[in-house]
Each structure stands twice: as C-alpha cells, then as structure tokens.
C-alpha cells in the first residue's frame, strides 16, 4: 500500500549536524489524503553535552525540562522515527523537509546506527516536500488559494501564514503535531485547486523523471521555482541545463537565464569560481554573483517546461522571456563553456575532512555491506555489551560514535575510565569552541541575558528562567 507520512520536527537549533530533535510528530494518509491510523507524537530527551539554542526554545515553547521529563533517550527516539519512515510504500513529506527535517533524520539515524539513507528508497519508498509545490503553485497557478504577503509586499510561504490566510487547522504554530495538521490541510487545498500541478510535482520525486527534463545536450530551457531565486520574482526563473556535475552524478549544473552571461564568459576559471562561491557579502562592491548553480535530481526540484508559462502574468514574476532566449543563444555560442564550467565545479567539489565523527556523515564515504550488517548488530546488542561491538567496524568514524552512543543513552554501563572520558568530552564541548561546538555555555547564558531585555521576549521570561536553570545543571 502506498501512503504519505506527513511529519515535522521541533529541534534545539537549526544545525542538523550539531543540534538535536526534541519533538517528532506525524500522520499517515492515503494518496487521496485520507488519514490512516492515529497520529504519532513523542519527545526526545535533550543531550547533556550541548545546550539548546535559547531562540529555538522561545519559538517552539519546548523547554529542556519538558523534553527531559516527557522524552525518550535518543536511541529509542530514533527507533520510533525509523519505524514510521521505513514502512514499505511510504512517501515521507514535510514542509521544507528535504533541506531541514530530512537532514535531521539522516544525522539522527547516523548517530544511532541505522543506514541514514535506506528508508528513503528501499521497499518502494520515496521523499517529497510541499514547500516548493506551494511556491510553484503561487508562481504558475495561483487561482483558488489565498497567498499572504510580507510587509515588503513579497509573498510569504511560511506555513503558519498560509494556514491563517486559508483558514487551515493549526492550533499552535511550531508545535510539531499542529504543524502536521496544517500541512495536510494545505496539501488538500492545493490538490483540489490545482490537481494537474499536484500530479506533475508528485512525479518529480523520481529522479529519472528529473533527468529527462534537464536536457544538457540542447540546453533546453526549463522553468525552475526555488527559494534560491528572489521572492519578488515569485521564486521563479528560466534555467538552461549545462552539464552533469563532474563529481556528483546526481547534480546538474544550470544557469539562470534572467542574467546576461556575456559579461563573464571571457573570465578565467578562478575568476568565475570567485564569483560563484565567494559569499555575497564578501564580493567587491559592484561585483555580482554569477548565477551558475546545481540542481539536485533527488531533491524534487520544481521544474516545468516553458509551456507551463502560457497564460501566466510574467510581468508579475519580473520575467522577460525574450531576454532569456537571447541569453540561451549566447551560452550555446560560447566556446568551451561546458568544459570550463565543469572545471570550476570540480575544483570546488571536494569536501574538507570532517574534524569530528558526528560531522562526517557526508565526508566519510559509504559503509561496506558487512559494516551495514554491523549496524543491525549494534542495535540488537544489550547496552551492557555494546563495548564489544567496536571491532565490527573498519570505518574509523564508528568507534567514537559507538562510545558516544553508549554514553548518551546508557551512561550507567560505562566503567570508571570511560565515565571520566565522557565527562571530559562534555566539559570540553560545553566550554570551548570546537568544530563540534558552536554554542558554549557562556554563549548560552549570554544569549539568555540578551533575550531578557528584548521587548518580544517579555512574555517568555518564565521560559528563560527555566533555560537558565537548565544551563546551570549542565555545568
């Protein structure tokens, strides 16, 4: 049976590698969006080796004391999350989930000895994300839905704003289960108002379909909707696919045809790279970014042929199709363009070595088949015997991950030497800025003090008091 599993996390911060999920909620539906079974919602105990970000706690209202009281140890939390997401035939869906929730899931599973990726594709499973469908709907087929605006007049795609504007069920924004109810309400609205667009975007969760659309041989122009384009343009542009990424087979290098390529085509590789990868704020005054980027075929990119623009108010999107056509012809006439672009992206593709195993999900390679079996062995081993499992892995990441897995979940099973090692690790992480630590306890307390003086936080002083107490317990 094919089903959707609509889900959401509330977390201790925005960094999926360093921060932690504190709440998970989900609802399973049929593909027709009829609810199947009861909703799920549970908390995770907060880690003792890292404080939560005070701002995140103010947004969610989840204090570490609540998570500690109601939550599961992370090993059990990960098992329950995986149990839901790995059901055969499941398409997991969220709102900005490909960039946020799924990254938290991958790192959660990685830390807790699951294959971080298998649940995404095995047994007919897939991933989807409603946020770019909402953007696509606003840009191409806005009829039948109320689109809220920000103060500057640009569209807002925040779930709570869309829910309020369209009278969708959402009792408490930034409560995971309430957000899931709002998400399903938005999905039903889009599916009813724009069924053809719904079906089109649903098909794009299969990467082969995306590959078929991105024709690099002819640089066939495609409509692309993404948060990487300004909201003032409806988050929409027309792109030209140029080449497959030389190192990452699942990425296609594309160019934003709204910009004239003539002024950079004669630059050398280094100059082009500087204008692609240098942070915008660090570019010299008057120098603009070159809008070369990649599209990830497994991230459900919001693509459509130019025919989708028929009947669309293109001036509303600040889209000049004639200029896009000219810019494509300029690209097609450029000598050695593809080779040059591939060299630039190849030089920039190497990931720096991770300085800590918890940061090495993407930089450490894939496990062998035997080591994947060892993941199941670790999860099945009684906590008091886990220390014996370290020899099952050749991958150097996993010996340290195993020690932290034991220490965070079952500290009572550590011997005296291991306990001292764990306490030293926690002290270092709480007191010093390292690759793994971006928020020390001093930073945490300083931010609480700052928030106490901010007008917007005056009704949250009791929550800030609880955060202060929690930090003092960690010292």
Give the location of each predicted region.
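Acidic catalytic cores of enzymes that act on phosphate-bearing nucleotides/polynucleotides
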Residues: 202-283
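Long, charge-rich C-terminal accessory regions
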Residues: 246-427
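Metal-dependent phosphoesterase core characteristic of DEDDh/y 3'-5' exonuclease domains
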Residues: 18-24, 28-29, 34-62, 83-195, ...
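C-terminal non-catalytic accessory extensions
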Residues: 421-475
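Short hydrophobic beta-strand that contains or immediately precedes a catalytic carboxylate
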Residues: 6-8, 256
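Extreme N-terminal starter segment of soluble prokaryotic enzymes
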Residues: 1-5
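Metal-dependent phosphoesterase signature
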Residues: 59-77, 84
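Short acidic, Gly/Ser-rich segments with clustered Asp/Glu that frequently serve as metal-coordination loops
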Residues: 10-17
């Amino acid at each position: 049976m094919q089903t959707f599993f609509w889900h959401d996390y509330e977390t201790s911060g925005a960094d999926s590698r360093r921060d932690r999920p504190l709440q998970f909620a989900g609802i399973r539906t049929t593909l027709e969006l009829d609810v199947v079974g009861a909703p799920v919602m549970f908390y995770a105990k907060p880690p003792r080796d890292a404080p939560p970000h005070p701002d995140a706690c103010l947004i969610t209202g989840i204090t570490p004391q609540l998570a500690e009281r109601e939550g599961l140890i992370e090993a059990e939390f990960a098992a329950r999350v995986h149990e839901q997401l790995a059901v055969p035939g499941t398409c997991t869906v969220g709102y900005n989930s490909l960039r946020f929730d799924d990254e938290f899931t991958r790192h959660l599973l990685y830390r807790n000895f699951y294959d971080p990726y298998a649940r995404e594709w095995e047994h007919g499973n897939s991933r989807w994300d409603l946020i770019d469908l909402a953007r696509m709907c606003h840009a191409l087929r806005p009829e039948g839905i109320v689109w809220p605006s920000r103060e500057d007049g640009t569209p807002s795609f925040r779930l709570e704003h869309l829910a309020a504007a369209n009278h969708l069920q959402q009792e408490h924004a930034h409560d995971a289960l309430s957000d899931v109810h709002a998400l399903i309400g938005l999905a039903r609205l889009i599916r009813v108002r724009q069924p053809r667009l719904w079906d089109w975007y649903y098909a794009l969760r299969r990467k082969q379909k995306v590959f078929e659309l991105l024709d690099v041989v002819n640089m066939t122009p495609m409509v692309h909707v993404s948060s990487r384009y300004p909201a003032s343009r409806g988050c929409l542009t027309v792109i030209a696919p140029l080449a497959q990424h030389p190192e990452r087979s699942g990425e296609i290098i594309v160019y934003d045809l709204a910009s004239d390529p003539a002024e950079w085509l004669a630059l050398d590789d280094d100059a082009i790279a500087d204008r692609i990868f240098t942070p915008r704020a660090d570019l010299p005054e008057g120098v603009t970014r070159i809008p070369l980027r990649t599209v990830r075929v497994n991230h459900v990119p919001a693509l459509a042929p130019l025919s989708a623009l028929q009947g669309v108010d293109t001036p509303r999107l600040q889209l000049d199709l004639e200029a896009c056509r000219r810019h494509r012809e300029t690209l097609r006439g450029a000598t050695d363009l593809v080779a040059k672009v591939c060299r630039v992206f190849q030089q920039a593709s190497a990931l720096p070595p991770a300085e800590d195993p918890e940061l090495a999900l993407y930089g450490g390679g894939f496990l062998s088949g035997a080591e994947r079996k060892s993941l199941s062995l670790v999860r099945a081993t009684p906590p008091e015997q886990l220390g014996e499992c370290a020899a099952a892995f050749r991958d150097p990441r996993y010996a340290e991950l195993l020690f932290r897995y034991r220490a965070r979940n079952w500290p009572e099973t550590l011997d005296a030497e291991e306990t001292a090692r764990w306490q030293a690790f926690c002290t270092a992480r709480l007191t010093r800025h390292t690759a793994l630590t971006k928020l020390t306890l001093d930073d945490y307390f300083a931010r609480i003090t700052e928030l106490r003086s901010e007008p917007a936080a005056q009704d949250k002083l009791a929550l800030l008091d609880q955060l202060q107490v929690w930090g003092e317990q960690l010292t």
